[in-house]
């Protein structure tokens, strides 16, 4: 997603970019933020619009200050999260050490879902801890089932025990079964994990090598399987006409409202205001009211952004992320809504 000349030169992100990904029946709006601590403001903007987060940790460097800052942002915005340990294809990378560092910081909330298989120091596959099965890569992300090697059994049992404890804590019935020595089915484990990830009591750890596309499909499966439906997350502000709380909650049927979480000014792209639609369906040529600037804005064209590529769309639905071109008075942090609503998310934050 890095397209800026300076990003290409540095070989790292310096600003947030939107990368929509369609995976199965789901659309995932990925806000790819810089990992360097120098650009933490970009991550703050993205976190304010996100419904969940994936914290990327270098398998070589391990947990760093940026990792902890990203975790703190997730805590601030109450975001469900998972951790993706990258660079597993590199020599001398220890997934186990990264998991130990994370566990030392965040305790029993850390729960690995996968662990790597290595032969002669090379990353050749992984063990799915939920399914208790091994997979060997045969070509990039293509894989086949394989036996679990003896050298992996000790840590597999340790990581699996952590998962089973989390499953047991979701209900009295499961707790009784756990202490009775009963096994949980894969479906029961997955359902319990989704509940625990949603409320933040469990933070899954995945791993792979995006350069080789290894582990990417697993990550997308885990995002769709374990992160909560955004419509279940509260999204509210103040209706200034009534001075009452307006629960937007990403409802298509409610009056239109959206927040501006980032402004892009590019010599080639021009000025774009990136928006998260909180309720209703926003269409090009809508006239919306900016409560913060006390002015109306007539929308022109709407876009979804794929990195540096703007794609024009006729409308954006509640819960989606997109961009509006050439707003005049609107700034980052402002709220747009219909006149009948006069919705502001800022006012709600001050309650």
Give residue spans per PLM region.
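Structural and coupling elements of P-loop NTPases
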Residues: 1-346
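A short, hydrophobic C-terminal helix/tail in secreted or cell-surface proteins
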Residues: 347-351
